[in-house]
Structure formats: structure tokens, C-alpha cells
Amino acid sequence: GRFGGGGSTARSGGVVYAGGGSALQQHAGYADDREQMFEYLRMEVRDAVDETLLWRFCEQSLDQLEWLEALGVPFPPTAVSPRKTSYPEDACTLYFSGNEAAAPFCDGARPAPRGHRVAGAGRTGSVLFGKLRAATAASGAEIRTRCQARRLLTTPNGDVEGVEILELRAPPAIHRLHAMLFELGSWGAMFSPRLVAFCQRSIAALERRWGRALRIRARGGVVLCAGGFAFNTAMMNEHTGWFRVARPLGTLGDDGSGIELGRSVGGAVGEMSRCSAWRFISPPTALTSGILVDHSGQRICNEEFYGGTLGQRMALCEG
């Protein structure tokens, strides 16, 4: 990766969405199955995800969870978070992470908590990614950081046969500065757009000075695994409407470069206007007993909705 690895996953809450009767669900006394999970998710995603793919996700959910546990990702059985919350306390590893218990979703599918939180103190995305990284290293795969994918290499008939990267070949002090600017720009995004722009320019300058272009040939294809484009002002202005005025959440790696690489060789894109802008009103849970209204006094939605849904409904309000 261009930076140190992990991206937004390493900064996340470490919540894995899984269901169908996991050990944690059974321990907490919840009967769940793949069919109920599918019905709920179908209401959530609507036509954004092909139903065949959605069913495969539900069908393989428990296998994925067991695979993570086999890699050492900790999901010890605990009590379900006892209240509506945006993120559970350290003592909980299972909670209602979406709209499962909120109407109208609970009318169409039996509610069950499916947010499996990696055990640990605070946000545990770093624990999740740490285990994945360790397993990757143990497999013998070569891990390269401070390497930016710049261009996909193609054959005359358009097949992708490799990738051109820009590797930061610099003294340790420059690597530390590169990492510091990444952290500063990623965390500072909530406070200062100018700081983000400064860090982006500084990182680009370091890469121009110390970067070395390399070409890597691929025998079995190239997999693009990158973030969104919350930190790309031009793409936000082009695609996202009102969301463009919100402060970006993620890391400086969410610059849309992976999307643009795919498009450069004819890849199709969709749902580019979709954004997740969270607005949590609980805790305190007392606020969910109130009525959330728009500028004209009309109720916006069920106040117990997940923060991502709540934020989206608020953003769609006129005025």
C-alpha cells in the first residue's frame, strides 16, 4: 500500500457483520438463520447488490467468522450490549449494529444482533487488521508498504498483465515523516481542510523526490483493493451532491486512486453518489424517544435507525 497498511479497516471499530446462528448469537440466546439475515439485508441494500451475491454473503457468513477466529481474531462470547448504542462498551462483543430491531425492518425479518465486535479496549480495527497482516506474512507473501500503484500495465489486446508502482526509497527519517504526515492529515480532516491539503501536497513532494518507479508483472491477474474517495475533493464535487460539504472520515488513502485505476482499463463504476454520513443520537437512549423533524416540522424517520441511515435521511431533506 501507499502508506503503512490497514487503511480505514485498522482505524475502524473492528465490527464484523455476521449471522445465521454464530456461537456468540447462540450464547446470547438469539435464534438466527441465513434466511432471516438475507431478508433483512435485502430490505437494506435494495437493488444495490445482486441477490445471488447477497445470498452468498449470508450463506458464507459463519464460515468467514470461523476463518477469522482460526487466524486468532478474538470473538469471546459475552452478553449483548444492553442498550441502543452507536458502538458497544469494551465488555461486549455482540450488538445490534444496524436497523435489525427498528421498524419497518423488524416487521420483515426476525431481529437478531449481528455486529460481532473484535474483543479489546476501544476501537479494535487495529486488532483485526493486525491478525490479518500476521497471517499474510506467515503465508510467505511479500508485503510492500510505502508503494503507490500508479498505472495498470496492459497487453495490446487490453488484458491487464501487471502494475507500475512508485516505491518510496528513502532514509528512515523520510519514512517517519511520510508516516507522520499521513497520520496528521487523516486525523486532522475533522478539523481543518487546509491541514489535509498541506499534508497531501507534502506527501506528494516526498514521493516525487524519493520515489522509484517499478513494474511488477502479474501471472494471474491484479486485484485492486483500495478505499473510497472521501479525500478527493474533485471526485466529491463531481459525484456526491450535498455530501461534498461534510468533513471526510477515513484516511488520506481514500483518494479514489483505486477506482480510477479500474476505470483506466475499462472497469465499470456505479453508485458513485452514495455516501455514508453518520449522525448518531444515542447514547443517550432518551433521545430516541423524541421526534426528529426537518425544517418544516415533518418527521424525518424512525429515531432508532442506525446512524448511517439517519445521516442519509437527514441529508436528503430539502433545505
Please state what every model-predicted region is.
Residues 1-13:
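Glycine-rich FAD pyrophosphate-binding loop
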Residues 9, 48-53, 67-85, 268-275, ...:
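A short alpha-helix-loop-beta-strand transition element characteristic
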Residues 16, 160, 299-300:
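Hydrophobic "anchor" residues
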Residues 16-57, 69:
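Glycine-rich active-site loop/strand segments that organize a redox cofactor
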Residues 56-212, 233-234:
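Conserved redox-cofactor binding core of oxidoreductases
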Residues 259, 268-319:
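An anion/pyrophosphate-binding glycine-rich loop and adjacent beta-alpha core
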